[in-house]
């Protein structure tokens, strides 16, 4: 199904749901373009369905994690709750999907703290430069009362329910055709990033000039010299074949990125309590499993890029103290100092 067709289908689904109620099953996708879920629907009236989308390719490890989540939910719910997984932005652009979600449609999405920060500013701190440092810290924060309060505000004011933030991509580094080891040397470098304020401010604090481009245009942007490089985790960079268009991997490790899985509060509340628990538990389970696997796979992705000719400037050779000092500007610009202090207190830092 082409993106336009699926987006139109979702709009119609949303309109129908206003009359039929969000707890009912959405119309199935056209048989010629089924989503990547092996789940079979239970008898009508006993099944709930979530259409889950993301921007990544079918080859991305997270996509397989979402298929695992779908299968785990199907098995644990005896087929009463079905998740259909749509990669490659097939459900539409993120802004449109989140808007449909806010209206109560049975859609879910992979997003990040930067995007959620547009609704509740404090979320942005989770993607601020040199903030989180490890998967263990993410696990520790899964029961955070501070983040729980932010989630409550997001749900009450914007009808967006956080199911999990256990999907960790790890450290992001700069991939560029220019070599640099400190903020001064990065000055003037045009680096592709996402458009949310914390991305722009955080990447800008490294000394370079952030340029917002869609994820799918990253490779072409570097190839055509629209930008000098990008900032990504090793696995994502390798999947996009950035080694074909960038000479250097600068190990800034400026962001430690975890992603959020969200859905509509209205739709979530339409589920029986046992299905709500299954949905969340299986989401966390699949997220932690892929996060642990990606920690192991990062070294292999890095080596593949090195074998293709990328020169690595290792973390130990970067002036990290200078980068960290410069990153304070991002916290101040986005009013995140109090949020940082609250989370650091919970982490014992």
Where would I find each of the regions flagged by the language model?
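Short beta-strand-centered segments that line the small-molecule binding cleft or hinge
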Residues: 140
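C-terminal motif of bacterial Sec signal peptides marking the signal peptidase cleavage site
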Residues: 17-21
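Sec-dependent N-terminal signal peptides
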Residues: 7-14
């Amino acid at each position: 199904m082409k993106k336009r067709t699926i987006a139109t289908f979702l709009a119609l689904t949303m309109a129908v749901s206003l009359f039929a109620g969000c707890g009912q099953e959405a119309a199935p996708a056209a048989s010629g373009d089924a989503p990547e879920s092996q789940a079979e629907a239970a008898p009508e009236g006993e099944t709930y369905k979530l259409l889950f989308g993301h921007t990544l390719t079918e080859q991305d490890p997270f996509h397989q994690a979402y298929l695992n989540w779908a299968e785990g939910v199907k098995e644990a719910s005896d087929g009463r709750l079905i998740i259909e997984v749509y990669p490659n932005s097939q459900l539409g652009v993120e802004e449109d999907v989140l808007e449909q979600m806010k209206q109560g449609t049975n859609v879910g999405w992979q997003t990040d703290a930067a995007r959620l920060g547009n609704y509740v500013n404090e979320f942005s701190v989770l993607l601020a430069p040199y903030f989180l440092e490890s998967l263990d810290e993410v696990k520790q924060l899964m029961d955070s009362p501070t983040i729980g309060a932010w989630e409550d505000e997001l749900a009450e004011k914007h009808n967006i329910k956080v199911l999990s933030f256990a999907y960790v991509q790890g450290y992001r580094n700069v991939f560029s055709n220019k070599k640099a080891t400190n903020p001064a040397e990065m000055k003037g470098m045009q680096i592709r990033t996402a458009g949310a304020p914390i991305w722009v401010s955080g990447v800008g604090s490294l000394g370079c000039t952030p340029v917002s481009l869609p994820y799918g245009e990253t490779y072409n942007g570097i190839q055509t010299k629209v930008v000098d490089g990008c900032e990504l985790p090793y696995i994502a960079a390798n999947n996009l074949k950035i080694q074909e268009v960038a000479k250097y991997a600068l190990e800034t490790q400026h962001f430690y990125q975890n992603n959020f899985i969200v859905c509509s509060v209205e739709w979530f509340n339409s589920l029986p309590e046992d299905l709500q628990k299954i949905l969340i538990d299986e989401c966390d389970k699949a997220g932690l499993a892929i996060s642990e696997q990606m920690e192991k796979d990062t070294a292999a992705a890095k080596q593949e890029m090195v074998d293709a000719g990328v020169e690595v400037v290792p973390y130990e050779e970067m002036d990290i103290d200078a980068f960290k000092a410069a990153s304070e500007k991002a916290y101040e610009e986005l009013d995140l100092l109090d949020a940082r202090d609250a989370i650091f207190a919970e982490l014992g830092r």
